[in-house]
């Protein structure tokens, strides 16, 4: 990890560690740690939260870290703190795909367990899966959690990392949230992942700035 930290500092200005608020178990907000792979202030410029193929905001070292998933290594500190586990649903942003109050009760079931460094959705499409399906995969995991399933996920994760499969935000995703008019009814909005840009207010409220 020291070698990675030195490489990041030599490659671009800014902190080595990127901190970002995520939604954890039972809706608890916590700060997730990653090796910084983008230029400072990237969330406020260009395509916002997500990076697409060839995104100029991703640093040279960042491209390598993302391709190998080494940018996720600092999350082992989250594991030691008890915020995360090795396997579980990946923790979403506090405002994307939608805010906490917009999740249905069924969708909130994915927060019944600690979020993971890797998970069932990550080995079944990873970044190429739209959010409704991703959440369903997470809920399925909660219903079927077992040591054997976790071991299976870990082996699949290793295979995904070595093949660099499904590691690009390449297409459109569909997000849905309950409407205010009809309880339980959902609306679907098709958006390009690359266009999800948080407002300055959201960034300030969630402290999603690299410190």
PLM regions with names:
Residues 56-59, 145, 149:
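A generic "alpha-helical surface" signal
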């Amino acid at each position: 990890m020291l070698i990675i930290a030195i490489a990041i500092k030599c490659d671009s200005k800014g902190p080595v560690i990127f901190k970002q608020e995520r939604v954890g178990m039972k809706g608890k907000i916590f700060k997730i740690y990653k090796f910084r792979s983008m230029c400072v202030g990237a969330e406020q410029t260009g395509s916002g939260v997500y990076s697409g193929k060839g995104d100029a905001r991703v640093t040279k070292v960042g491209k390598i870290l993302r391709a190998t998933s080494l940018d996720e290594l600092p999350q082992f500190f989250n594991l030691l703190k008890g915020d995360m586990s090795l396997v579980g649903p990946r923790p979403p942003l506090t405002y994307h795909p939608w805010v906490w109050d917009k999740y249905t009760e069924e969708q909130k079931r994915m927060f019944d367990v600690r979020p993971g460094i890797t998970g069932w959705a990550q080995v079944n499409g990873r970044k190429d899966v739209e959010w409704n399906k991703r959440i369903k995969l997470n809920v399925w995991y909660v219903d079927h959690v077992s040591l054997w399933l976790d071991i299976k996920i870990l082996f699949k994760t290793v295979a995904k990392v070595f093949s660099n499969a499904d590691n690009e935000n390449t297409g459109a995703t569909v997000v849905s949230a309950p409407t205010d008019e009809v309880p339980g009814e959902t609306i679907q909005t098709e958006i390009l992942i690359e266009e999800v840009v948080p407002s300055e207010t959201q960034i300030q409220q969630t402290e999603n700035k690299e410190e």
